[in-house]
Amino acid sequence: MTEQQSTRAQIKQSRHQAILEALATQLEQHPGQRITTAQLAESLGVSEAALYRHFPSKARMFEGLIEFSEDTVFGLIRRIVDEDDNAVSRCEKIMALMLGFSAKNPGISSVLVGTALTGETERLRHRVSQFFDRLETQFRQILRERELTLTQAGGRPVNETANLLLSIVEGRLQQFVRSGFRQSPLQGWEQQWQLINTILKVYA
C-alpha cells in the first residue's frame, strides 16, 4: 500500500468512526426515539448521500456499534481471563466491565437492550442476542473450569449460575436505558456484588 492509499484508508476509517460516534450521541440525546438518517446527517453537517458512501444502510451503522461493543468488551474479557486465574474474581471483573462500558456508552446501551432497534431489521436483534449468548458462554466456561478443579467436583448449577450473572447484567442495562440514562448501571454495584458473591462461594 502506498502512502497515499494509506492516508485515504485512514480518512475513510475516521469518517466511519465519526458517523458511528454521531449515531451513538443521537441515541443518547434522544432516548426512546427512532433516529433517522436525515437527522444523523444533519448532526454531522453532511448529506444523507454522504452517509451512504460509507455505510450502505442504517442497519450497517447499527452493526458497526455492535461490532465496536464486541471488539471492546470481549477484548478486555480476554485480558481479564489471561491476568486473573480466580473464577469468582473473573466473574466480578467481567460484570463490572459490562456495567462500566454501558455507563460510558449510553447510546450503545440502548442498542444492546434492543430499544433503539425498534422497526429495524431482525438481523440486528440476532446480532445483539449473539453478543449476550457469548457473554453467558464466557461465564459458563469460567465456572465450569473452576468446578473441574474442586475436590468435590459436580453438582454445582453451572448453567443456571451463568444465566443468573447474565440476567443481572442485562437487568442493570435495561434499568439504565429505561430511566433515560439517569440511573447508572454502576449505582449500588459494590453492595450488590457482596450479595452475588455469597452465591458464588461454592466456586471459591
Where are the model-predicted features located?
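Basic, helix-initiating cap at the start of DNA-binding domains
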Residues: 1-43, 60
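Short hydrophobic/aromatic patch on the recognition helix
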Residues: 45-55, 61
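Hydrophobic alpha-helical connector segments
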Residues: 64, 78-104, 158-165
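Alpha-helical DNA-contacting segments of helix-turn-helix folds
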Residues: 27, 62-69
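Amphipathic alpha-helical segments used for helix-helix packing
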Residues: 103-126, 174
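Amphipathic alpha-helical packing segments from all-alpha helical-bundle domains
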Residues: 71-74, 122-148, 159-163, 187-197
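Amphipathic C-terminal alpha-helical segment
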Residues: 100-104, 108, 141, 162-183, ...
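Helix-turn-helix/winged-helix DNA-binding modules
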Residues: 27, 32-33, 53, 82, ...
